[in-house]
Amino acid sequence: MMKLNLFINAKETESYIDIHAPKMNDHVQSIINAVNDLDKSHTLVGYIDKEIHIINVSDVITFQVINKNVTAITSNQKFKLKLRLYELEKQLPQHFIRISKSEIVNKYYIEKLLLEPNGLIRMYLKDAHYTYSSRRYLKSIKERLSI
């Protein structure tokens, strides 16, 4: 059980969080990630033809570059975005992982991983399709998934 203290002080000029822990562990890291994600975008604007849609980021399974356009893929729709993948990556919460030059996946939609003989990771996603990681991102993927 973690102890929580809240101190309200009108003399403070800004809000801040201090974390006191005997050591760094997964629980502490998840708190840090949650706090960092507070400033991240939780919705995006996507397009289907001439329709404009507000997309809940947590519904997105993967962001892929398709025909030079960034596409957000949910379980039932594909939305074109006007952002570049590197811009999007900066705005997304911590549970999105860059797996290649052209794709970012939501780690909560990863069902299983298969290590290929060529060193790549085949990621099976919960929408019944799979994708491959790039070797360039392999170290980062393993760190983010704690494998």
UniProtKB/Swiss-Prot annotation:
Protein name per the record: Uncharacterized HTH-type transcriptional regulator SAS2254
Keyword vocabulary terms for this entry: Cytoplasm, DNA-binding, Transcription, Transcription regulation
One Gene Ontology molecular-function label: DNA binding
Keyword check for Heme: no
Alphabetical list of SMART domains matching this protein: LytTR (SM00850)
GO CC, one annotated term: cytoplasm
Localization per record: Cytoplasm
Main location, first listed in the record: cytoplasm
Coiled-coil ranges per UniProt: none
InterPro entries the record matches: LytR-like, LytTR_DNA-bd_dom
PANTHER family: HTH LYTTR-TYPE DOMAIN-CONTAINING PROTEIN (PTHR37299:SF2), TRANSCRIPTIONAL REGULATOR-RELATED (PTHR37299)
The HTH LytTR-type domain, residue ranges: 44-147
